[in-house]
């Protein structure tokens, strides 16, 4: 084992593995590759900004401190980190790849696996929360914050463990024949294990939502109200978009785990599938704000404040009687509106 870890700082190991698994090492920085890299980085910056606005909105407004929105905030955090990880992955790809040590390569790829794991477990936590809210039409107990934080913390801990297994030793540095083609320093068995875990979790989430749907449709009006159905529709859309975006990448990884080295040319195009999967982190904030009026107002508040600030600067020296009115909080916009206080209505009353 000591010999294995001693290879982590050997800069020749990465090139050795790429030479073994790839037919050709096309690592030249061409103009088209530069344009593609620039586009991906811009896309990832948009992902970071979008999800940061969602996190700020959830943090600053107490209306969004319910279990449902905290779990959505956790999903936004994983999407934000996914954007950061993909920027790092893009900057450290191409010609830079062959100059990396195995340790740096594991850090580059492991960060992406960690954020993916966090997204999957966030979706599972949301499904469990919906099941609890539907099954128990009452507010959580006084220990709800502790239990939510423990669930979120556990999801990140498991994600760190899953993403960190290769750097802890589950890799193919000493066994070239066991290496993945898409991820040449990862063992095929590790890739197969992770994709299987994710697939089983996603199937379990789908089964949970099917069960919740039938429970809601067959329940009384206090459970199957329009807000409850709208919130269920929102989280179902989030799940569906995740599956659509990641299914091609999961399929490529499953093929990679079973295909002999250099026998499946489609594996050399895997980066297109992962780029498509990244769209999931871009679309999630759009879904949240599209489906929730209050969250949409809160997310747009910093942009409106910035716009009003520019307008105030442009009017300096003008009519002193003309002043900008401060933005009202989203909660004040709904003042006077009384809604039922069961958890399904309490957490779903902002969904359109």
Swiss-Prot record:
Membrane topology: Multi-pass membrane protein
Extracellular compartment segments: 1-34, 96-109, 174-189, 256-271
Cellular compartments annotated: Cell membrane
SUPFAM superfamilies listed in its UniProt record: Family A G protein-coupled receptor-like
CDD domains: 7tmA_S1PR2_Edg5
Tissue expression profile of the protein: Expressed in all developing tissues with highest levels detected in primitive, transformed cells. Relative abundance: lung > kidney = skin = gut > spleen > brain > liver.
Function: Receptor for the lysosphingolipid sphingosine 1-phosphate (S1P). S1P is a bioactive lysophospholipid that elicits diverse physiological effects on most types of cells and tissues. Receptor for the chemokine-like protein FAM19A5. Mediates the inhibitory effect of FAM19A5 on vascular smooth muscle cell proliferation and migration. In lymphoid follicles, couples the binding of S1P to the activation of GNA13 and downstream inhibition of AKT activation leading to suppression of germinal center (GC) B cell growth and migration outside the GC niche.
Protein family according to the UniProt entry: Belongs to the G-protein coupled receptor 1 family.
Protein name: Sphingosine 1-phosphate receptor 2
């Amino acid at each position: 084992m000591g010999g294995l870890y001693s290879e982590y700082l050997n800069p020749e190991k990465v090139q050795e593995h790429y030479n073994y698994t790839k037919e050709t090492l096309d690592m030249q920085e061409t103009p088209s590759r530069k344009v593609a890299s620039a586009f991906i980085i811009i896309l990832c910056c948009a992902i970071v900004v979008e999800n940061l606005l969602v996190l700020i909105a959830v943090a600053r407004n107490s209306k969004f401190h319910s279990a449902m929105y905290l779990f959505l905030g956790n999903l936004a955090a994983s999407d934000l980190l996914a954007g950061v990880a993909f920027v790092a992955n893009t900057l450290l790809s191409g010609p830079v790849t062959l100059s990396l040590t195995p340790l740096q390569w594991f850090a580059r790829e492991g960060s992406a696996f960690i954020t993916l794991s966090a997204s999957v477990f966030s979706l599972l936590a949301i499904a469990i929360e919906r099941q609890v809210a539907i099954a128990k039409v009452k507010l959580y107990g006084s220990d709800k914050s502790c239990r939510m934080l423990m669930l979120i913390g556990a999801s990140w801990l498991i994600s760190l463990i899953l993403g960190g297994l290769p750097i802890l030793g589950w890799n193919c540095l000493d066994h070239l024949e066991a290496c993945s083609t898409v991820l040449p320093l990862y063992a095929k068995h590790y890739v197969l294990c992770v994709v299987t875990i994710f697939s089983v979790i996603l199937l379990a989430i789908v089964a949970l939502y099917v069960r919740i749907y039938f429970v809601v449709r067959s329940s009384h009006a206090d459970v199957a109200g329009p807000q409850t159905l709208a919130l269920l529709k929102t989280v179902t859309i989030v799940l569906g978009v995740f599956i659509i975006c990641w299914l091609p990448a999961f399929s490529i990884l499953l093929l990679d785990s079973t295909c002999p080295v250099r026998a499946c040319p489609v594996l050399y195009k895997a980066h297109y599938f992962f780029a498509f999967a990244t769209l999931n982190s871009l679309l999630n904030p759009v879904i949240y704000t599209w489906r929730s009026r209050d969250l949409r107002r809160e997310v747009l508040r910093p942009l409106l404040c910035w716009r009003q600030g520019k307008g105030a600067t442009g009017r300096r020296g003008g009519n002193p009687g003309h002043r900008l009115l401060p933005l009202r909080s989203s909660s004040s916009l709904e003042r006077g509106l009384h809604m039922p206080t069961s958890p399904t209505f309490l957490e779903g009353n902002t969904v359109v």
